[in-house]
């Protein structure tokens, strides 16, 4: 057999590894060889991979320097000299710029400044919050015209003794009664055990001769009639409730006494209700 390597032009690199056998009288000078199949490495599964012996072979044994060039192989640099260490001196206070000195020497001054800034900020925030709350509460308060109607001044000399005068206050009838000495003694002598809503006469008046009441029946809100009823005080025509001259319920379905508003005597002849 005769072995001839085929070579032809640009395909020579591709065809150089091929051979063709031709029958002949001469023996081939070079026998065609078949590349041997590489053997697969056998791994020892019982041997730990992350051991001192396995890792020591991969560790760097000498310093490497990065090189760049056409004929220079690439390498890894494990040591850098161009790294800039960050400097925070601009953000530090002058008292602690020197790293060789202890910061305890200037700690009191630095703490005092921090406390001062915190205190000033707290006062400013509290003042702003106070103004905001004040404005919010003021917006919810009644206007000047409403406040003017919230109080009423009554001249007492216009009400004769033994008479009752009605006024309009906050949309409700207001009774002002000038009692006689007989009425005062009569109401003061009433036993509390006889009353449905026990209350002494002196607890309902500031001056014995003057009784100030809200003229609304405590049963269903009707307006009682003054100087009427079985007890000479007030009488509700709706359901027959009887009140005495002190405004206390004595007979009928009303459960409570007539309400006594807040009032104040500014002089002997003037009273302000509200």
Swiss-Prot record:
Its annotated compartments are: Mitochondrion inner membrane
Its encoding gene is what? UQCRFS1
Q: What is its EC number?
A: 7.1.1.8
- Give the cofactor binding note: Binds 1 [2Fe-2S] cluster per subunit. Fe-S cluster delivery to the Rieske protein is mediated by components of the iron sulfur (Fe-S) cluster assembly machinery that reside in the mitochondrial matrix (including HSC20 and LYRM7).
Which residues are in the Rieske domain?
187-272
**Would you tell me the protein name for this molecule?**
Cytochrome b-c1 complex subunit Rieske, mitochondrial
Report the cofactors: [2Fe-2S] cluster
Q: Give TM regions.
A: 104-140
Q: What class of enzyme is it?
A: translocase
Q: How is it modified after translation?
A: Proteolytic processing is necessary for the correct insertion of UQCRFS1 in the complex III dimer. Several fragments are generated during UQCRFS1 insertion, most probably due to the endogenous matrix-processing peptidase (MPP) activity of the 2 core protein subunits UQCRC1/QCR1 and UQCRC2/QCR2, which are homologous to the 2 mitochondrial-processing peptidase (MPP) subunits beta-MPP and alpha-MPP respectively. The action of the protease is also necessary for the clearance of the UQCRFS1 fragments.
Sorted alphabetically, the keyword list is: 2Fe-2S, Disulfide bond, Electron transport, Iron, Iron-sulfur, Membrane, Metal-binding, Mitochondrion, Mitochondrion inner membrane, Respiratory chain, Transit peptide, Translocase, Transmembrane, Transmembrane helix, Transport
Q: Where is the signal peptide?
A: none
Q: Which reaction does it catalyse?
A: a quinol + 2 Fe(III)-[cytochrome c](out) = a quinone + 2 Fe(II)-[cytochrome c](out) + 2 H(+)(out)
């Amino acid at each position: 057999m005769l072995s001839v390597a085929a070579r032809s032009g640009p395909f020579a690199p591709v065809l150089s590894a091929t051979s063709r056998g031709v029958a002949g009288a001469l023996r081939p000078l070079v026998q065609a060889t078949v590349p041997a199949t590489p053997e697969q490495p056998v791994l020892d599964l019982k041997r730990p991979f992350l051991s001192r012996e396995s890792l020591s072979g991969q560790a760097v044994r000498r310093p490497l320097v990065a090189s760049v060039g056409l004929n220079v192989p690439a390498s890894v640099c494990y040591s850098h000299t161009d790294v800039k260490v960050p400097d925070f001196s601009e953000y530090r206070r002058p008292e602690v710029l020197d790293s060789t000195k202890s910061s305890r020497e200037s700690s009191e001054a630095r703490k005092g400044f921090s406390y001062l800034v915190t205190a000033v900020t707290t006062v400013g925030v509290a003042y702003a919050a106070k103004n905001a709350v004040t404005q919010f509460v003021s917006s919810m308060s009644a206007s000047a015209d409403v406040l003017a109607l919230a109080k009423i001044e009554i001249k007492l000399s216009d009400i004769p003794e033994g008479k009752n005068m009605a006024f309009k206050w906050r949309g409700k009838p207001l009774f002002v009664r000038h009692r006689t000495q007989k009425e005062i003694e009569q109401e003061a002598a009433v036993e509390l055990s006889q009353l449905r809503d026990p209350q002494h006469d002196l607890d309902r008046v500031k001056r014995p001769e003057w009784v100030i009441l809200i003229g609304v029946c405590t049963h269903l809100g009707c307006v009682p009639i003054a100087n009427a009823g079985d007890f000479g005080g007030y009488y509700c025509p709706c359901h027959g409730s009887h009140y005495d001259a002190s405004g206390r319920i004595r007979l009928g379905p009303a459960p409570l006494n007539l309400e006594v508003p807040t009032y104040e005597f500014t002089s002997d002849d003037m009273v302000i209700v509200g």
